[in-house]
Amino acid sequence: MRYIDYGDGGPPGVLKLAEGPRPVPKAGEVLIEVAYAGVNRPDVLQRSGSYPPPPGASPVLGLEVAGRIVETAPDVTEWKAGDVVCALTPGGGYAEYCAAPAAHCLPIPRGLSVKEAASLPENWFTVYDNVMTRGRLKAGETILIHGGSGGIGYSAIQLAKVLGGATVYTTAGSAEKAEFCRRMGADVALNYREQDWAAEVAKLTGRRGVDVVLDMVAGDYVMKNVRSLALEGRLVQIAFLKENRIPDFDALPIMIKRLTFTGSTLRRRTVEQKAAIARPLRVHVWPLFESGQLRTFVYRTFPLAEARAAHELMESSQHIGKIVLEVKPG
């Protein structure tokens, strides 16, 4: 089969089309003939050497796919060959065939294309768990979402608004991106290049602060987030686009305001832990796609052989929404 190899890692130019053996599904897994694969920031980090795959995972890039099941392990009963699914994968998505846990597969929501479905798993597993479970967002609360125009960001905006019933503030890096966030449901979108977002959040909330912050930036954003939270607020850290260290960290406001500072990664969780996220997604979120209350947005699609260009676009941060690789669209 064809797949994308990144050799010893490095800049996007290391990504090359290669030939390799087709994976064999292990117990509890299915083999998917990949039609489309989503491109995500962790793929870029893995390629550059700063996010190695966990033990036992495929070394091939790609954490989400959509396509047709062609084989199942003997113990798999919930899916069969011929079923068309989207799936969260532990790796291996940038390939013509990818093995994935059966419990991490979801049907294509009615009304969405296979290409659109490939853009769902990584974002929605991440967002549902971190906003609803770890962030404990409740109806009537306020949430600040950083990076609202990216895949995680616009998914979180919609989830918080439609399922969470919250007031949503978000940050974005341009007027165009801010407008996109508003179209996705954000009540207020702040251009962080032109506005002091922390000062604006203070004004918008009457200096009360927000109940939840979902952050992918870290670095000097952390203490700004802490100061932007209300009493009993929750800061959920899911990435660090700046740095993982916190300059000028001060624990006192966390203690005074009784804040919860939590964080998570998705890829290193067990199969069972990820399956526990898939179940409520199918019950509570997938019907909202089918009713048109939730949307996905694929900004650009590249052929598998042009994975380099897809990564260059991801690293430029010029995109809005999702980037997808076309593998074997059928």
Regions picked out by a protein language model, each given a short descriptive name:
Residues 118-195:
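Mid-domain Rossmann-like dinucleotide-binding core that forms the NAD(H)/NADP(H) cofactor-binding site
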Residues 197-207:
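Short amphipathic alpha-helix with an adjacent loop that forms part of the alpha/beta core around
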